[in-house]
Design a protein with these regions (language model features):
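Intrinsic, short, N-terminal disordered tails of RNA polymerase sigma-factor systems
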Residues: 1-7, 11-14
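Hydrophobic side chains within well-formed alpha-helices
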Residues: 9-12, 23-24, 52, 73
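A short, charge-rich alpha-helical start-of-domain segment used by transcription regulators
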Residues: 13-36
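Amphipathic, Lys/Arg- and hydrophobic-enriched alpha-helical face
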Residues: 28-46, 63
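Structural recognition of an alpha-helix C-terminal capping motif at a helix-to-coil junction
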Residues: 37, 51-58, 62, 71-83
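Arg/Lys-rich amphipathic alpha helix in sigma70-family domain 2
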Residues: 65-68, 79-94
């Protein structure tokens, strides 16, 4: 997804912190490919990867206020995705 001129990642994240659904959708579309790539590495198949990706984004939006703006967003997102995939795997093994 290409951002509109003048709309920076930081601005999208800021609006996500205020609860803007439009900006949550923008963030989802912007990082969907990146998130799926990570999820596919930690999942058994594409359907599981899609569930991990969607669950991870739900966690991101619920906890976006805990994101530290001084660190790269992608690194934080990656951590959330990996932890979500591991949690799902543990749940499936039970």
């Amino acid at each position: 997804m290409h951002l509109r001129p003048g709309v920076a990642e930081e601005e999208i994240i800021h609006h996500c912190k205020t609860g803007s659904l439009k900006h949550q959708e923008m963030l989802y579309k912007l990082f969907y490919g990146y998130a799926m790539g990570i999820s596919l590495r930690y999942s058994l198949n594409r359907d599981d990867a899609l569930e991990v990706t969607n669950d991870a984004f739900i966690k991101v939006f619920k906890s976006i206020n805990s994101y530290n703006n001084t660190k790269p967003f992608k690194a934080w997102l990656r951590t959330v995705i990996i932890n979500t995939a591991i949690d799902r795997r543990r749940k499936d093994l039970k």
